[in-house]
Amino acid sequence: MKVIVLKAVAAAAVLLMAASSHAAPTLVRDARVFDGERVHERRSVLFDGAVIVDADFRGAPPAGARIVDGAGRTLLPGLIDAHVHAFRYLELPLLFGVTTQVDMFNSVQIMQELKTAMTAGKNGGRADMFSAGTLATAKGGHGTQFGMPIPTLATPGEAQAFVDARIAEGSHFIKIAWEEGHGAHRMNSLDAATVTALIEAAHRRGKLAVVHISTLAHARAALEMGADGLVHLFIGKDIAAADADALARLAKAKRAFVIPTWVVLESMAGVKTDGVLSDPALAGLLDREQRQSLRASYGQSPMPEQLVAPKAVIAAMHRAGVPVLAGTDAGNAGTQYGISMHQELAALVAAGMRPGEALAAATSAPARAFGLGKRGRVASGYKADLVLVEGNPLVDIASTRRIVEVWKDGESTEPLRVRQRERVARENAEPGMAPVTLPADGRISLFTKEKLASPFGMGWSPTHDGMMGGASSATLELLPLDAGAPAALAVRARVVKANFPYPWAGLAFGPGAQPMQPANLSAVKTIAFRVRGDGQRYALSMMSRGVTIPATVHFIAGPEWKEVSVPLSRFPGIDPALLTMIGFNAGPEPGDYRFEIADVRLLDK
C-alpha cells in the first residue's frame, strides 16, 4: 500500500482547541444521523464550541444548552467539495451546507490567509479550504489563462524545485495539469516525463499528487505513473465497457481516487439541469450575479451524448470499489459554490451510487483521501461542522437541499443565511437598471473620422491581451465611405503566442459608462453586422456581470461583404440585462489578421 504522510493535519487539531469563547452547547436531539459512513436512525448529538463532545448523547441536556429538534430530520457532517477554485464568495458554500472546500488552484495570498485563519480557529464565517496553491503546468498551458502570472515548468529536472516551492508556500497537496486542449483549441502541456517527475517529487516530500486529465489515454497514463487521484473525468459520446472497467481496475490497483466533477462536464457538454436553480429554497440564497454563473455554460449547444462516457466511468469506478469523491469545479461556468454540490450528489446517484455512498463521497471519503483531519464525520472529538436537513437523504438524495440549519466550528450560520435571503429579496424587489432605449434601426456603430461613437455606452476601441501580459495588438482604421452605406472600420490584428492559452486582439464595444460596467440590454434579441476580410475565423464574444469567461460564437470573414445575424440565445449564461462587453476578436492562433466591419446592430427581434 502506498502511504502518504500528510503534515497539515496538525492545523485541524490546533483549530479544535482554539476556541476561547463560544456559544452555549448545542444538542441536536432525536435525529437520524448519517455519521459519514453509516446511518443511525435515532441519535442525539452534543457539540460545544468547535468540537462534537458526544456523537451518541444520552441523558439530561447540559444546563443552558440549546436544544434543536431532530425529529423527522437527518444530521449530516458538513459537506466537503473535493474540487473548487475558491477565489471569491468564501462564505457562500456555508449557506448550502458545504463547510470545507478542497481547492485545486488559487492565489498564494488567498491560500495563506485562509490557512492562517483556520490555524487560529478564526475562520467561522467562511468555508475552510485546503489548497494546492499554484498548479503545475507548462508555459502557456492550462491554468495560465486567468491573467495572473504563475511559475511554470518545462522539464523533469525542474520538478523537485517546483514542488518544494509550493510546499514552502503552504500547499496542502500538488495538482498537476496534463491538458493538451481539444480540436482547434490546442494548448501547451507538460510532457509525460515531467508529469511523472512531479508525482515522484511530491511523494518524496510526503504530499499527494493529483492530476487534471481530459482524455482516457491521459487518465490511464497518470494512474500508471502513480497519481494519487484524478481530479476530473472526461466527456465523450461513448466508451467501451472493457475500457471503463480496465480504467477502474487500474485505479483500484493503484489505490487512487477519482473526482468526476460531473457538474462542469455538463457545462462542457452544454447541458443545463435547472434543478437547483428551480428550487426556491436554494435559489433564494443566490443574488443575480451568483445565479448567472450557474446559468452559464462552456458548451454552446446541448450535447447530452457527450456525457455517456463519464457516466459509464463513474459506474465502473463505483463497482470496482474506487473512492469516488464529490467535487464540482466551482468557480467555472455552469457552477456556483455550495449549491452545485447538491447537483453533483444527484448526478452520482444517477450514475449508480446509493444515496449513502454519495453522501460519503461528500464527507468522510474526501476527508480521508486528502488527509483533512477530524472532519467529514459525526463522531466524538471531530469538528463540529454539521448540516441538519428535513427528511431522509439516505432515501431521497434531494433532501440535502432542504436545509434546516448549518453549523461551522459549532456556530450556527443561520444569521448569515438570513442576511443573504434578505439581501437577495431586496435585490429582486428593486427595479434594477433602466433598460437602454435602442435606436430605431438598432445601429450602435456610429463611426466617423472624429470618433468611433455609439448611441450609448463608452463606444468602440481596440482590445487585446495586454491586460494579461500578452503582446498581441490591434489597430483600427476608418474606411472611405461608400455612397449611402454606413461607415466601415478596418481592424488589423496581430496575435502573438503567449504564456496563456487564448491570446486575442480585435475590436470591443463597451455598453456601460465605464469599462466593464453593465448596461441593461434586455430588449436585445439579436446582434447583426456586416463583415468581410481575409477568410479567417473570428470570435464574436459577449460578457455579462458575474461571468468570468466570455461566451463566444465564431464567424468567417470572407472576401465579400456578408450579413451575420446571431441570436443572443446562442451565448449561454450571458444576461443581456447585465451586459458588460461585446467583442470581435482574432485568435487564439498566432498570426496577422484583417477584417472590416460595418453596420453593427442590436435588434429587438
Walk through the language-model features, giving the residues of each:
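Histidine-rich, glycine-flanked metal-binding segment
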Residues: 33-76, 193
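Extracellular/periplasmic ectodomains of large secreted or surface enzymes and adhesion receptors
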Residues: 405, 409-437, 555
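Divalent-metal coordination cores built from histidine and acidic residues
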Residues: 70-75, 90-209, 246-289
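Acidic, glycine-enriched loop/beta-strand segments at the rims
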Residues: 33-44, 57, 336, 354-359, ...
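N-terminal signal peptide c-region/cleavage motif recognized by signal peptidases
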Residues: 18-20
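Active-site neighborhoods of metal-dependent hydrolases
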Residues: 161-183, 236-351, 425
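Beta-rich carbohydrate-recognition modules and glycan-binding surfaces
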Residues: 429-605
